[in-house]
């Protein structure tokens, strides 16, 4: 927080993030006023003025489409495609990261098959998982719990209903995205989740996004471009998967997937960068301000030490304890200990 207020502009992923940021500033810093106009928050402190705005990051649609249809990507996906063997696909593409809520996603899939056993031979759950922070004990335990749960589900239903593909291979993941019926993004919290945008752009099967309402991408996809879920609600997640697979008409799926693709393509990563560069040139300043606020250089180099060179409006924030284990980690540890 101390470093962020030293900037002239602070870019965040979503409007909700901007609201949280400005609220935090008002809680931690004295004599702060915040006003908003046209999506731009202007923050005044004792010493200076700066701005905050949402810049939702985009993708490079043309590039991801080229990769998805490349021969290299198809070769990388061929073995997984063979195991799928014509079944409907629920897909997730994520790092092995507790906030991604992978365990609950698997539990929702297990519940789906428990409640609708006719789907056992007709649907598979393809996991494209990238190992992450393997040197951290909690992450290793989380990865182990995923592996155990995958095995448990496959043993339970007597089929390879979950296909667990490990490794960082963008081409393989994008090739899989071309075929999904459902792409599941049930993160506990996520700044954006670009994989959802990539999936929307490359999918050729009228696939539908099922997205956590706490993922940044949902703020762009919530109005008719996806199905929203509460990430901790396993039953709602299972119901949403079933809705796409068996209740939505082909026309409904086509309409939703087309809208998602249009949204994901409409604001690219190039636009995202250009918007920030444009705003940094002063165009962001609202029209009701008589003249642009000049960039202000303030002594923030020593912001993290006890120097008195800090602006008076910037005070040291209290140290906090590390956050507790997030709920999905607790669920996964119970599985790992079984």
Go through the PLM ranges and name each one:
Residues 1-337:
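Catalytic cores of carbohydrate-active enzymes across secretory and cytosolic contexts
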